[in-house]
């Protein structure tokens, strides 16, 4: 077992049983290709999502260090911040969130609904900033201030995307390989690529467990030139933690995130509506809608390595739908 070193790292069990891996019959008929979906949108806490896999490792480390406060950062409609706040509530910890308004909107629905509404329910302390220009440095400044107030803070990076958090998606690759074994030979895997931890963790895990499958990251905020070093650096950091080699090429498509992070586009919204109407599954306008737009266009443009089955990693995000009305 090449991933045996995973068990060396403390981990809290938030998810329990594997999330479903499902065939999408009506969507497959529509696209003329076998499409499967990994349902990380239905993880148990706070309306689900992929960040819970990372938080199993990060929160365990926070408790090991004796922290009483989790500090993290993201957009006003950040799924990661919402899930971090929920984990803090479950563990009896304080949570401080440094938020930015990445789309510069004054729309009350965006500023108060969706994920932002849930932060208040979790009793999160909100700190606003003009922009997360250097989030790691900004989080350290905030942590110093919180510590001076008598708390013991633990900083979780944007998206939970460091080598420790990304182990959650090495673990996910193991889960996927076990679910596919003897059932389906996945040719291609598609995932949204943002803060890069999910993408990099899958890259390390799938290289060792499903080496014949190509992994495509559809960017949601950056060009390939800007995103590639982020994914590669995390890929190598994860491999170092696990004492593995990681030589798989990182594949990125950056044609689907315009006009920018957090701003809906027509292709992404059409993908959201399509999956809702054909399969009753909810995507979101920021991450999974744009990633699914890439999958759909990738089939029509013959961008995949062959015509075999495709697995879409559903990372969650549906709470943001409420904040993006009337785009939806």
From Swiss-Prot:
InterPro entries: ACCD_DCysDesulf, D-Cys_desShydrase, D_Cys_desulphydr_bac, TrpB-like_PALP, TrpB-like_PALP_sf. The modification N6-(pyridoxal phosphate)lysine is found at residue 51. Keywords: Lyase, Pyridoxal phosphate. It catalyses: D-cysteine + H2O = hydrogen sulfide + pyruvate + NH4(+) + H(+). GO terms for biological process: D-amino acid metabolic process. Its cofactor is pyridoxal 5'-phosphate. This is D-cysteine desulfhydrase. GO terms for molecular function: D-cysteine desulfhydrase activity. Pfam families: PALP (PF00291). Belongs to the ACC deaminase/D-cysteine desulfhydrase family. Disulfide bonds: none annotated. PANTHER family: 1-AMINOCYCLOPROPANE-1-CARBOXYLATE DEAMINASE-RELATED. Its EC number is 4.4.1.15. Catalyzes the alpha,beta-elimination reaction of D-cysteine and of several D-cysteine derivatives. It could be a defense mechanism against D-cysteine. Homodimer. The keyword Lyase applies.
